[in-house]
């Protein structure tokens, strides 16, 4: 075995930190509105950004092209089909395709898999350019604050109720879109992510924010995320839990 030491870089002074941020990812996925977070979360994130600016941290808004986000989601879902649907009977996949699932890959082939991986590399290259000029990217974790827990239901090892309705500012959205839209893309691309708590809604529900780093820069991201939390984070122990 090779012992690779973990070396943490030095902290940058606040005025040398450069943070990119985006308040939404501009695309609707599976017919779900995913391009606008809840008003309560938006206010808290706006306050978080303002605190960073007051501490002389450079914060610049980054807007992603809808075509890029849509393409990345297509790659994510096609990979999911190739690597996960493999365990389903072929008739199940054919049925999904006939019912209009645009991401179901039928039939499988090595060439298709390599093509999807190449497209993944292309999405990674575009995202990596963001980190040429910034220490981190911050964006929402979910479309809203925490909501009432949905008890999972399984059948034959499969989660059944991942499309339960969640109300965001009066609009009904499936919980899979609420929970995963802002996180799955970084699972696809392999970026390290840290979630820090930044505030609470008027009803006391917590809101967090993702701090995303460049690939293979986990140690640096830990330092940057800690700095951002020290400046603008907000954590409270839940009632009934010891400090």
Where are these regions (language model features)?
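Short beta-strand micro-motifs enriched in acidic
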Residues: 199-201
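Amidase signature
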Residues: 1-181, 188, 216, 230-243
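Short, well-ordered beta-strand elements
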Residues: 205-214, 221-222
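Short amphipathic alpha-helices in soluble, non-transmembrane regions
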Residues: 224-228
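A short, aliphatic-rich beta-strand micro-motif
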Residues: 192-196
């Amino acid at each position: 075995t090779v012992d690779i030491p973990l070396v943490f870089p030095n902290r940058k002074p606040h005025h040398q930190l450069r943070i990119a941020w985006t308040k939404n990812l501009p695309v609707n996925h599976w017919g779900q509105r995913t391009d606008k977070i809840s008003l309560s979360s938006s206010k808290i994130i706006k306050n978080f950004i303002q605190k960073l600016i007051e501490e002389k941290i450079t914060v610049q808004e980054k807007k992603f092209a809808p075509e890029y986000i849509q393409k990345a989601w297509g790659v994510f879902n096609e990979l999911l089909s190739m690597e996960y649907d493999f365990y389903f009977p072929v008739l199940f996949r054919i049925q999904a395709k006939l019912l209009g699932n645009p991401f179901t890959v039928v039939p499988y082939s090595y060439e298709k898999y390599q093509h999807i991986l190449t497209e993944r590399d292309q999405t990674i290259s575009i995202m990596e350019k963001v980190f040429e000029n910034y220490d981190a990217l911050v964006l929402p974790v979910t479309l809203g604050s925490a909501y009432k827990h949905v008890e999972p239901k399984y059948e034959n090892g499969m989660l059944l109720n991942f499309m339960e309705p969640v109300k965001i500012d009066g609009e009904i959205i499936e919980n899979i879109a609420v929970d995963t839209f802002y996180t799955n893309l970084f699972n696809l691309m392999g970026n390290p992510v840290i979630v820090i708590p930044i505030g609470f809604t008027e009803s006391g529900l917590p809101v967090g924010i993702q701090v995303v780093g460049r690939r293979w820069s986990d140690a640096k991201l830990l330092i940057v995320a800690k700095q951002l939390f020290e400046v603008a984070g907000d954590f409270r122990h839940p009632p009934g839990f010891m400090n």
